[in-house]
Regions:
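Generic hydrophobic alpha-helical membrane-segment signal
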Residues: 35, 80-81
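Short glycine-rich substrate-engagement loop in P-loop NTPases that contacts/grips substrate
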Residues: 56-80
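A short acidic, Gly/Pro-enriched loop at the edge of an enzyme's catalytic core
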Residues: 83-86
C-alpha cells in the first residue's frame, strides 16, 4: 500500500516475549527482498549478539538486510545528506529505542532514535514503512524508559503525513494521526 500510494506508514506489532515478533520481522524483510527488486528492507536490532548470530546463520545475504540499529542511525540519523536505499525498516524491540538524552550521550546529538528514524522516512522522496516490533514490558536500560510515547512524539514532529497501523490497545496513543 505505501509504495502504491507513495505514503509513509508506521506499523506497530506488539507481543509478549517469545511470541515471534523477531521472526515475523526477519521473514518480512527476507520475503520482500525476494519478491520485488524495487522493495528493499532492513532488519534493525539493538541486540548486538542477536545481530551477530543472524549474520552468521544467514551468511552473505544477511549483511544486506540485518544491521545493528545504532550503526544504521550513526550513518543515516544525524546525517541529513545520507539516505538509505531501503524503504522498509523493521526495528526489533522498538520500545527500547533510546530517548534524546541517551542519543546525546552516545552519538552527540539530541534527537531520540524514533525521531531519527521518522526523519529518515521524511527525507525519502517516495515512500517508507517503519515496522516497530514492540515487546511488552521490556524497556530495561537507561534511556529506554519512555518507550512507545517516543514514537508518537516523533510522528507528531514530522513534516509529513504518516499512516499508523497498530493494535486496538494502542490506538488512543496514535488516534490524532489517522
Amino acid at each position: 500500500m505505501a509504495k502504491k500510494t507513495n505514503s509513509n506508514c508506521l506499523v506497530l506489532v506488539t507481543g509478549v516475549p517469545g511470541s515471534g515478533k523477531t521472526l515475523v520481522g526477519l521473514q518480512l524483510v527476507y520475503t520482500l527482498d525476494k519478491l520485488d527488486e524495487e522493495i528493499n528492507g532492513v532488519f534493525l536490532s539493538g541486540n548486538g549478539p542477536l545481530v551477530e548470530v543472524l549474520k552468521h546463520a544467514l551468511g552473505k545475504e544477511s549483511k544486506s538486510f540485518v544491521q545493528p540499529v545504532h550503526n544504521f542511525l550513526k550513518e543515516y540519523g544525524g546525517n541529513v545528506n545520507s539516505i538509505p536505499h531501503e524503504n522498509i525498516w523493521v526495528y526489533d524491540e522498538a520500545q527500547r529505542a533510546w530517548d534524546s538524552d541517551q542519543v546525546l550521550a552516545k552519538r552527540g546529538h539530541g534527537n531520540s532514535e524514533p525521531d531519527d528514524i521518522v526523519k529518515i522516512g521524511d527525507r525519502i522522496n517516495s515512500w517508507s514503512v517503519i515496522v516497530a516490533l514492540i515487546g511488552e514490558g521490556q524497556s530495561i536500560h537507561v534511556g529506554e524508559e519512555v518507550g512507545l510515547p517516543l514514537w508518537a512524539n516523533a510522528i507528531e514532529k514530522s513534516g509529513k503525513d504518516w499512516r499508523i497501523f497498530c493494535p486496538e490497545k494502542l490506538e488512543s496513543d496514535f488516534s490524532e494521526f489517522n
